[in-house]
């Protein structure tokens, strides 16, 4: 069939377009008769849905569309205490938070600039999962996922800077600088730039 005759058929409203689809007609009568004869020959037993269906209806599928989240079904909460020595260990803290575990970071073993970087990194990950963060002590921080509620009853006492008098003659000023505890970025702005 040529293109012009097809266009004429479309314009004229011919639904079958000169029997182009007749070639695709299935010969179902012969197949149905053969299947019907084989069923009667085998004693007329009924086929089960799994025998006649090409798809596995059961196959271990329980019919539930619920996808489990790690840590949600467990009854006990888990707290990870981490004492990292380098920034390279911080992705483990983020992974623990993603698994809905609380993380306590003790950063006393790290250099102050690396500790500040680590606190900011984990604080960003905690913010991304809508978690909570709290400074527990000097260079010790608590990071919790959103499923954990963190409350601090002595927030005023914990956030107020404590003044410790030191004898400046006995301790060189350079060692005071390196032993300084990191202050997270979210507390530096609220505490007046400690």
From Swiss-Prot:
Its main location: cytoplasm. It is found in: Cytoplasm. GO terms for biological process: division septum assembly; FtsZ-dependent cytokinesis. InterPro entries: Cell_div_SepF, Cell_div_SepF/SepF-rel, SepF-like_sf. GO terms for cellular component: cytoplasm. Signal peptide: none annotated. Pfam families: SepF (PF04472). Residues 35-54, 159-194 are annotated as: Disordered. Keywords: Cell cycle, Cell division, Cytoplasm, Septation. Cell division protein that is part of the divisome complex and is recruited early to the Z-ring. Probably stimulates Z-ring formation, perhaps through the cross-linking of FtsZ protofilaments. Its function overlaps with FtsA. Belongs to the SepF family. PANTHER family: CELL DIVISION PROTEIN SEPF. Homodimer. Interacts with FtsZ. This is Cell division protein SepF. It comes from Prochlorococcus marinus (strain MIT 9313).
């Amino acid at each position: 069939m040529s293109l012009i005759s097809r266009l004429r058929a479309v314009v004229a409203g011919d639904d079958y377009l000169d029997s182009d689809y007749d070639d695709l007609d299935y010969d179902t009568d012969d197949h149905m008769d053969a299947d019907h004869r084989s069923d009667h020959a085998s004693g007329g037993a009924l086929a089960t849905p799994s025998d006649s269906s090409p798809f596995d209806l059961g196959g271990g599928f329980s019919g539930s569309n619920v996808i489990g989240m790690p840590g949600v079904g467990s009854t006990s909460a888990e707290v990870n205490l981490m004492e990292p020595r380098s920034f390279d260990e911080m992705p483990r803290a983020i992974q623990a938070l993603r698994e809905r575990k609380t993380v306590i970071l003790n950063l006393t073993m790290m250099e102050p600039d690396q500790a500040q970087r680590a606190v900011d990194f984990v604080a960003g990950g905690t913010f991304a999962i809508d978690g909570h963060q709290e400074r527990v002590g000097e260079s010790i921080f608590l990071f919790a996922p959103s499923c954990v509620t963190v409350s601090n009853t002595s927030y005023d006492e914990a956030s107020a800077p404590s003044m410790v008098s030191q004898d400046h003659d006995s301790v060189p000023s350079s060692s005071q600088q390196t032993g300084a505890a990191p202050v997270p970025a979210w507390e530096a702005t609220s505490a007046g730039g400690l």
